[in-house]
Amino acid sequence: MSYTIYPAIDIRAGKCVRLEQGDYNKETIYGESPYKMAKSFQDAGAKWVHVVDLDGAKAKRPVNDEAILTIAQKLDVPVQVGGGIRTEQDIDRYINGGVARVVLGSVAVYQPDFTKQMLAKYGEQMAIGIDARDGYVATEGWLETSHVKAEDLAAEMARFGAKTFIFTDIARDGMLTGPNIEACVALSKAANANVIASGGVSSIADLAQLRAASLAGAIVGKALYTKRFTLEEALAEGEL
């Protein structure tokens, strides 16, 4: 997997928002139309778009799925989706609806056998999202912290066939404090797989460091919305 920049769209109540450290009480709305935002990313040159159903993550089922399917069907670039995906039916609906890659998060912790089956069925169309707080996996829209270490979960999921992981350091998400490169690299080594870094990217230099660390990509959200840099600048640096 080559290094890829994933502009991020987090959807809550049908709008494009960003949270700080996953806190639903610390929300900023950046747009009324997720599709228009996604289209603007595509027009700027994005090779992928990353979409999260924040309501879904909390409700443990897809909530903004119609908006997400609209994005997947109308864009010409592949779309990666996470948030509230818990059943085979959820996965089927997204994949059959045009989503290129589905991200499983909490379910990987609580239903490893099911996750193994889904990895066997969907292969490269699946990614495992590992969101960590102080090294331990957080679940249920980050409202709970498990007793499972991020690296242990990554190693187990890699044995089950996972090839792509998305690692988020919750303490840095939405804070523009720089990504946790050390943790991303440790996870990549534990799983011997592709790791996409998420959380904390604040500058073009951060993207360059992630690329230099041989990671598979970076998910960029708040830095774009707050105009720390443009997507065109990020793509020029990151995807050479």
UniProtKB/Swiss-Prot annotation:
Pathway assigned to this chain's UniProt record: Amino-acid biosynthesis; L-histidine biosynthesis; L-histidine from 5-phospho-alpha-D-ribose 1-diphosphate: step 4/9
Any one Gene Ontology BP term: L-tryptophan biosynthetic process
Main location: cytoplasm
Subcellular location: Cytoplasm
E.C. number: 5.3.1.16
Pfam family, one: His_biosynth
CDD domains per the UniProt record, alphabetical: HisA
Enzyme class: isomerase
InterPro entries: Aldolase_TIM, His_biosynth, HisA_bact_arch, Isoase_HisA-like, Isoase_HisA-like_bact, RibuloseP-bd_barrel
GO CC list: cytoplasm
GO MF terms held by the record: 1-(5-phosphoribosyl)-5-[(5-phosphoribosylamino)methylideneamino]imidazole-4-carboxamide isomerase activity
Keywords: Amino-acid biosynthesis, Cytoplasm, Histidine biosynthesis, Isomerase
Residues annotated as the enzyme's active site: D10 (proton acceptor), D131 (proton donor)
Catalytic activity: 1-(5-phospho-beta-D-ribosyl)-5-[(5-phospho-beta-D-ribosylamino)methylideneamino]imidazole-4-carboxamide = 5-[(5-phospho-1-deoxy-D-ribulos-1-ylimino)methylamino]-1-(5-phospho-beta-D-ribosyl)imidazole-4-carboxamide
NCBIfam families listed in its UniProt record: 1-(5-phosphoribosyl)-5-[(5-phosphoribosylamino)methylideneamino]imidazole-4-carboxamide isomerase
HAMAP family (UniProt xref): HisA (MF_01014)
Family: Belongs to the HisA/HisF family.
PANTHER family: 1-(5-PHOSPHORIBOSYL)-5-[(5-PHOSPHORIBOSYLAMINO)METHYLIDENEAMINO] IMIDAZOLE-4-CARBOXAMIDE ISOMERASE
Name this polypeptide is given: 1-(5-phosphoribosyl)-5-[(5-phosphoribosylamino)methylideneamino] imidazole-4-carboxamide isomerase
Source organism: Shouchella clausii (strain KSM-K16)
Gene: hisA
